[in-house]
Amino acid sequence: MVINLWYNKQMKEWRWSLTETGIMTQHTGGQEELRDAMNDVANTVEYILDNALKEE
């Protein structure tokens, strides 16, 4: 799992991408507030992990 986080000045928002390299899936998002962007990333990781556990 690879997570990238950056600030886009033109859009005035924190952007993020999360790539699951093993299955070549990507999730992306953006928020004006850093804390909200980080929460989105955390929620996405938890969602991925919850679904991975259900598949086992």
Question: Which residues are covered by each model-predicted region?
Answer:
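Short, mixed-charge low-complexity intrinsically disordered segments
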Residues: 47-56
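Non-catalytic effector/regulatory segments
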Residues: 1, 17-19, 52
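Short N-terminal "domain-start" leader segments
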Residues: 1-15, 46-47
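Acidic, low-complexity, intrinsically disordered interaction modules
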Residues: 11, 15-27
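Intrinsic disorder/low-complexity detector
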Residues: 6, 10, 29, 42, ...
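A short, exposed loop/beta-hairpin motif centered on an aromatic-Gly-Thr core
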Residues: 22-39, 44
